[in-house]
Every structure is written in C-alpha cells, then in structure tokens.
C-alpha cells in the first residue's frame, strides 16, 4: 500500500474510546477486507459465551467452577448477593487495613511504622502485583515493595540483604496462595519466617495471609495469630486475580489508589461488553490474534511497550495469555495443541536488540506496540532545538512500526494517555477480556492449567526419588555411581534423574554428599559424609 492507502486504512479501523482514553490501531495487520464479516458469526458466539460466564455459568468445566474476575470490579453483576457483599467487604477491608498500617494503628513491634512490604507468592500471586508496583510506584510510595517470587535461595537472600535486619523490623509480609499448598510459596514463607527469627522478630506479628478459606495457609495464619487474613475465592484464577485482594492489598499498602485502578478496569469492562465488534477493543485484539496465528498459535506476539514503567507488562501477559491459551485439548476433547507465545521487553531498548531479526529475519510473529502519550510529570529538557527525549521515544516507536510494515511484518498499536492507576486498570481488563474472547473463538477452556499441575506432580516425583537416593547413600555407605544407585533402588530407568539430583546435592553442603568426578561426567561416583 502507498502512504495514502495506509492513511485511509488507519482512519477506517482506528478505535478511540473517550471514557478510557484508549486508542487501538489494527491497520498494520494484513487482514482482508472481508475478514470481519467472515468472523462475525464466531465473534457473536464468543460474546454469548462471555455473557453466560459473567452471569455465573460454569465456565471452567474441568474444575466445575464459575469464573468471576469481572465481578471483582462490578460486584452487582455477581449471580449471588453473598458474593457481591464479600467483594465489597474485601475492598473496604483492604482499604481500611492499608490506612491503619500507614497511620500506625497496625504497627511493627520494634518500629514505629511498617515501611516495607514483602510479597511472598508465585505466578499470578506475584506477576500482577510486581507489574502494578513497578508501573505505578515512585518516590512517594507509602511502603517499598519487595518480592519472594521463586524458590531460589540466592534470590531470597538478595532481597533480605537489601532489607537488612533493621529493614526487616519495618517489613510487613504478605503470603499469597489460594490453596495454601503451593510449595514455592510455602518455601518462601519458611525462609522469611527464619529470617525474622534470626533478627529476633516474631514473624506472626508481621504476617498477613491472602488465601482460600480453610486452606492450609488459612489455618496456619489463624493458629499463629497473624495480623490479618484476606480471601481468595475459588472462582478467581491466579492469573486473573489482580483486581482481587491478591493485587489490591500490595498496591494499597504501597499507596496506590486502588479504587481508581478498579474504576479503570470497570470502565474497560463496560467498553469491551459491546457487541459491535469494530467498537470493542478486546474483540479486535482477539480477532487480530486469530488472524495473525490462523487460530492455531502459528505466530508469536512480541509486546513492545515504549515506556519503562511497562517493562514488566510482557511478563504479566506471558502468564495471562500463555497459561490461558496454551492447551492440548479443545472443549470437545480434540487434540489441538493451541497457544499464543508472548515475549518482549521495552522500546526503544529493543531496537538495539532483536528488532533487527523482526525486520529482516524469520517472519513468525506480530508486534503489539504499547504507546503512552504523556512523557513525564512536568516540563522536559530540549535535547535538540524543539525536541525532547520523549519526542525521540515516540519517533522511534513510529519509525519501528514503519520499518516493520515496509517488510510486511504485522503490528498493532495500543495507546493510552498516561500511566495512572486508572489506565493500568484499563490495560489489565482489556487483555483479560481479549483472552476470554479468543478462547471462545478457538474453542478451548481458558481457565484451567493441567500442564502446570503435571509439572508440579513430576517435581514431586523427582524430590521423592532424590530422597530415596540420598537415604540409600547414607545407609549403604561406600562410593556409588548414579547407575548403581538406580539399579539398587529397582529404578534403572531413573538413572538420569538420580544423577542430576546428586550433582545438585554435591554442589551444596546441606546434604553432605561428596562427588568424585569422572570422565565422562555421568560415571562420577557419590558418597555421603
């Protein structure tokens, strides 16, 4: 297309919504003129499915659960008045608790105020809170956020070293786990508890739980007399929990206006309920994914936010989209191996990294640019006569978009006016709705994650086998190879797992395992001190 034709196409397909300030440009996606008409019946069926979901129909058949994250910002839509009341009560409790912490009503035992918040969680219990904290945080934060988001000992040590003993005395810990049985979160809680104990502090006087009623974590918090407990409901999945206490409590403690955040999500929900496809940005996103991937996950989505505050957005979207869309089976039980791979960093940094391949390498992707119109608070320096650093950032986004388009590389652009609690809420709600609509278009269950459970089960098997191997070494004595240990345990097929586990054990002093390296490495021998 020539410049005039591109301008006409841009005007035809540009969506602007005044209530949210959202602008969506899909003109650089190479769909045909009849694409929307051909997809309209499927899109209307997706709208129908979404209406049933919001009305409380069982939308996660594998777990026989409702899916209610949209109710979190519009409680009046909940199918049960008790659910609506619980949502409102939780937001009020989160707001009140944060105010009490900020005002010194809830205090640290050895400090006047809590000044830090340590969030202990993984997956949806960390990615959303991390994204929001980074996007909206600043020098005016009421509390500094820190995270244990993995079962990596060194990672937790780095956080604790940053806090120091004095900082830990001023740190409120939030443990987030719906089931209370997530091992990574359990490990983080135990590591934190030990750190508080080493500092002469009582963990329970610093601890808050966000969990399901009656869960293992809920019972632990109740028995230990923790400061407070907030609910996680079974109808809210981890990756869609950012507008629940999972996301609201850390944000409120940081000093972020959570009601503005909820208002942005609620306003976007209203917008994305429109059944007029070309006026619904979530529907347009879902259809662009379907067009680009042919409804089969054949292309990756590269997320390029041209804003440092949105650096973590691609990580958040990785879980939201890939855990929802990446499924082996469709709703009819047919093997489809569906998915949509998401990766990205930030612009214009990525122009000096992998944009070279995007323009000239394998064409197996489309780009989702995210643009923020407002550069900063206050005036900017003119780095050249008439131009600021922000002008350059905008120019690089537009230039990259043009350079990709010249090579037939597809892209869409999402524009918001500024980074505020409200617009971040809009972004969260926009992609949540797009995921649900796309899942309907490709006939999959977006709200379960059997692959995650399979990985957890396999990890449990590895740990059990490692325990057997270590016990055998200690019991039998001597120096043995992994092959010999596997044979002695009657598990010759597990020699590789045993070798890898003993390799790790020998590198750490905790298990008292000594390795005598050999060549090839797999013939190394192990003994117990």
Curated annotation (Swiss-Prot):
Q: Which Gene3D superfamilies match?
A: Glucose-6-phosphate isomerase like protein, domain 1
The cellular component terms of Gene Ontology attached to this UniProt record, alphabetical and capped at eight, are: cytosol
- GO terms classed as biological process: gluconeogenesis; glucose 6-phosphate metabolic process; glycolytic process
The pathway is: Carbohydrate biosynthesis; gluconeogenesis; Carbohydrate degradation; glycolysis; D-glyceraldehyde 3-phosphate and glycerone phosphate from D-glucose: step 2/4
Q: Which UniProt keywords apply?
A: Cytoplasm, Gluconeogenesis, Glycolysis, Isomerase
Q: Which InterPro entries match?
A: G6P_Isomerase, Phosphoglucose_isomerase_CS, SIS_dom_sf, SIS_PGI_1, SIS_PGI_2
Question: Is-annotated flag, keyword Cytoplasm?
Answer: yes
A Pfam family per the record: PGI
| Enzyme Commission code(s) on record | 5.3.1.9
Give its localization.
Cytoplasm
Q: Which reaction does this enzyme catalyse, per its entry?
A: alpha-D-glucose 6-phosphate = beta-D-fructose 6-phosphate
Location of the active site: 323 (proton donor), 352, 456
| Top EC group | isomerase
Q: Which GO terms describe its molecular function?
A: carbohydrate derivative binding; glucose-6-phosphate isomerase activity; monosaccharide binding
**What job does this protein perform?**
Catalyzes the reversible isomerization of glucose-6-phosphate to fructose-6-phosphate.
- Family statement drawn from the similarity comment of this UniProt entry: Belongs to the GPI family.
Identify this protein by name: Glucose-6-phosphate isomerase
What organism is recorded for this protein?
A: Geobacter sulfurreducens (strain ATCC 51573 / DSM 12127 / PCA)
